[in-house]
Every structure is written in structure tokens, then in C-alpha cells.
Amino acid sequence: MRMTANATIDPSEVARFDALGAQWWDPKGKMAPLHAINPVRLGFVRDVLVRHFGHDARSLRPLKGLRILDIGCGGGLLSEPLARMGADMVGVDPAPGNIVVAQSHADEAGVRVDYRQGTAEELADAGERFDVVLALEVVEHVADVGLFLRRAGEMVNPNGIMIVSTLNRTVKSFALAIVGAEYVLRWLPRGTHRWDKFITPAELEAEMGAAGFEMSELAGMVFDPLRGEWKIAADTDVNYFLVGKPAFHTSEG
């Protein structure tokens, strides 16, 4: 896919993630923090979608029949397991190296995912439509959050849903997500995040509203040091999810 002139991508961010290459699927490599939170992300997304679309949570393929777009899919850590749950998955990423890794891993695993190298804007321009649009750990890396959400929102079906996860802009997030994660614990490469690009839940809700969505759910994701694992919580000071529905959506019945 060809990059558009008005793309919301930040070239420096694309280059940084493109350089990760095969490390995407190494649970002990540079993407270890993403592997740590991935089960929680998947569980949250699955639960939200099952409730919204009235699917059977006990099914081995609870997302069957749903067309889902994973924006900024990276190496496919989210797309691939969602496809295993029955979703008709499309993953898009502007970094060509990410798509090569994602497609190779999916092929080896025998999982069908439609990976595309390009931007959300290009998919929107092509008239693509989805039941679900996901932008997890993405908006803190784009050049224009408002434009990104508007273009992503164009692709959500009237009864669909958009899920965004990102980092709050607080003193706590600076201490934990940047100083702690990048400089002290070295969970992430230095420079992975910029605190000034973090966005508060209120700001994100406003941008979602401008894109034609109303917030239906807000949840935090925190690390439990006693259990050594991540979990969903009410605390949105650092990591959080915002779920949005088209403002004029109709009932699923």
C-alpha cells in the first residue's frame, strides 16, 4: 500500500518499530513488556466484544463472524490470537518489516490473517468497513490523534465498536512508563515513549466525540507486583482502555 501525503504516521516512530524485526515474537526480548500485557489485552477485547455483539463467551471461537481491523498490528501479537478466536482479521502497519514478521509467523502457525503494509487512512480511502477497529498502544505514536481517530472511525460499521488503549499523561505515568520502564528496569528501549504524546482519558474521550463516537467503557490496566502480572482495574493513571460506539448506533436487538 502506498503512503498518503496526509498520513497520521510519524516516520521516526515507524522506523523505530520497523527495526525490531523478528524480536516481536521473542517473549524475553525487547517486546517482553508487550508479551506481558498481551493476555490482559486479549481478555479485555474478547469480553467487550462478546458483550457488545451478544456472542457466546464459552465458545472456542467467540469472535466468529466479526471483521476486525488491528491498526498498528506490529508483528501480529494481537491479530493472530484474535483470528484463532474466529475473527476475520485484517492487520495494518506502516512498517514493512513488521508485516513480514507478522505474515511469516501466521503462515508458520497456520493462522489466517490478512496483513497489509500501509496506513489506516489508505484503508479508509479504499472504503473498507469493519465491525471492530482496534488501536492498542498506537495513539501515543501517531502525529495527529484527532485525524487518526476520525479516519479510523470512518471504517466502523454503525453497530460496531472501536477500542483504544494508550498511556495517561500523569506524573505517575512519567515515573513508571518512562523513567521506570525505560531507564531503571529497562523493560523497553529508551525513547520508546514521549510523555508529551501521552493523552488523558478526558482528552481521548473528547477526540473520540469529535470523531463521532461516544464512550461506553473506560478501564485501567495495572501491574500487580505481588502476583507479578497485569490485570484490569479502575486505576487509569498509567495504562487504560477506552471503548467507543458510533454516537448514532442502533441496537443489536
Swiss-Prot record:
The keyword Methyltransferase applies. It catalyses: a 3-demethylubiquinol + S-adenosyl-L-methionine = a ubiquinol + S-adenosyl-L-homocysteine + H(+); a 3-(all-trans-polyprenyl)benzene-1,2-diol + S-adenosyl-L-methionine = a 2-methoxy-6-(all-trans-polyprenyl)phenol + S-adenosyl-L-homocysteine + H(+). GO terms for biological process: methylation. GO terms for molecular function: 2-polyprenyl-6-hydroxyphenol methylase activity; 3-demethylubiquinol 3-O-methyltransferase activity; polyprenyldihydroxybenzoate methyltransferase activity. HAMAP family: UbiG. O-methyltransferase that catalyzes the 2 O-methylation steps in the ubiquinone biosynthetic pathway. Belongs to the methyltransferase superfamily. UbiG/COQ3 family. This is Ubiquinone biosynthesis O-methyltransferase.
